[in-house]
Amino acid sequence: MTLTLNRQLLTSRQILVAFSGGLDSTVLLHQLVQWRTENPGVALRAIHVHHGLSANADAWVTHCENVCQQWQVPLVVERVQLAQEGLGIEAQARQARYQAFARTLLPGEVLVTAQHLDDQCETFLLALKRGSGPAGLSAMAEVSEFAGTRLIRPLLARTRGELVQWARQYDLRWIEDESNQDDSYDRNFLRLRVVPLLQQRWPHFAEATARSAALCAEQESLLDELLADDLAHCQSPQGTLQIVPMLAMSDARRAAIIRRWLAGQNAPMPSRDALVRIWQEVALAREDASPCLRLGAFEIRRYQSQLWWIKSVTGQSENIVPWQTWLQPLELPAGLGSVQLNAGGDIRPPRADEAVSVRFKAPGLLHIVGRNGGRKLKKIWQELGVPPWLRDTTPLLFYGETLIAAAGVFVTQEGVAEGENGVSFVWQKTLS
């Protein structure tokens, strides 16, 4: 039996296979192992994600380890915890999986997953149920961008029946996830109850939905092409979206621009209602307002007549973080990243009698380099164009009770290095 995967997609010599141990990924890995024998220079690895949702999860790890050992494929096992509020179990598990994939990928390596034609049909129907437009109805692409590399689905044109046939011919063994029989999950409901009925009436229903998905993808690609100049005109060098150029646009054109801007931020596809709210409640809010629309773990805000896509974070104005070993990086609270003092810069290092800390507010009048006279911190933020949501999350370096610098923004006159080896105050952000 010849390989059923689309070998034309496999142009990379480094491949990471998402391997759950189920039928689909077992057939995919088996075919890739065979393909590797024809292409000896290929480096093949597998990754199994342990969600901890099933009592059988440890047994599945053992099964995958045994299979990979037999086929001489290095296996990475990633254990994840699901704790993303506001998402269902399915969405949480998927998010955790793909985060694990992104962490595990090596430079130059591509991710290969085992979705097939029946999966594509289910994805299309789920998008239809949500009322999606062409972008959502495009379902899954055979090749897409992911984590700075590519995600490849070489079985997307094959039915589950073809995979079963392959597995039986080669006497493959796979695991059965008991949750796949739980039709309280939308995808399982479609797989177990709806799609079999549709295919009984129309045997080529899955192929037809795949064609519709491909046509939607084609239309979406054409829209991308036609709107590219508009998007470039509206987008600032910082990646924000300027409101004024969109004021004269039709509602449909404006919504399409906002959707494409969000796609460029790797944001989840917003609903039609969310697009209306972004424009009405954020972009068109009164001038003296600080509008904010929460979308999952992120927010859309307006500042200086621009829309900003940022990760939600709790203000830290009351927080004081001691930095006793200031020669080492300091982890900041609330997922803000880390700071460090690097050799070379215009900030004086602390004296031996000065306790170092990071804070997020500073009282009194401040004297910063490049400005005459004293100003309160709020006024400095305004003059320097620092957005409101960064004002109580930007790390402030203190020696004792003296403000020395704001990371990446300013240095105070008390913090200037004079005739000595200076340091720089560097903030490694983890936020958008």
UniProtKB/Swiss-Prot annotation:
Which reactions fall under this protein's catalytic activity? cytidine(34) in tRNA(Ile2) + L-lysine + ATP = lysidine(34) in tRNA(Ile2) + AMP + diphosphate + H(+)
Q: Name one GO cellular component term.
A: cytosol
Localization annotation: Cytoplasm
Top-rank taxon: Bacteria
Annotated EC: 6.3.4.19
Kindly state which keywords UniProt assigns to this record, in alphabetical order: ATP-binding, Cytoplasm, Ligase, Nucleotide-binding, tRNA processing
On whether ATP-binding is a keyword of this UniProt record, the answer is: yes
- GO biological process: one example: tRNA wobble base lysidine biosynthesis
Which Pfam families does this one have?
ATP_bind_3, TilS, TilS_C
Q: NAD: is it a keyword of this entry?
A: no
Major localisation: cytoplasm
Q: Which residues bind ATP?
A: 20-25
Tell me the InterPro entries matching this sequence.
Lysidine-tRNA-synth_C (IPR012796), Rossmann-like_a/b/a_fold (IPR014729), TilS/TtcA_N (IPR011063), tRNA_Ile_lys_synt (IPR012094), tRNA_Ile_lys_synt_N (IPR012795), tRNA_Ile_lys_synt_subst-bd (IPR015262)
Q: Which SUPFAM superfamilies match?
A: Adenine nucleotide alpha hydrolases-like, MesJ substrate recognition domain-like, PheT/TilS domain
Q: Name one GO molecular function term.
A: tRNA(Ile)-lysidine synthase activity
Q: Which family does it belong to?
A: Belongs to the tRNA(Ile)-lysidine synthase family.
Q: What the protein does?
A: Ligates lysine onto the cytidine present at position 34 of the AUA codon-specific tRNA(Ile) that contains the anticodon CAU, in an ATP-dependent manner. Cytidine is converted to lysidine, thus changing the amino acid specificity of the tRNA from methionine to isoleucine. This enzyme is essential for viability.
List the PANTHER family hit by this protein, alphabetically: TRNA(ILE)-LYSIDINE SYNTHASE-RELATED (PTHR43033:SF1)
Domain description: The N-terminal region contains the highly conserved SGGXDS motif, predicted to be a P-loop motif involved in ATP binding.
Read off the HAMAP family from this record. Answer: tRNA_Ile_lys_synt
Q: What is this protein called?
A: tRNA(Ile)-lysidine synthase
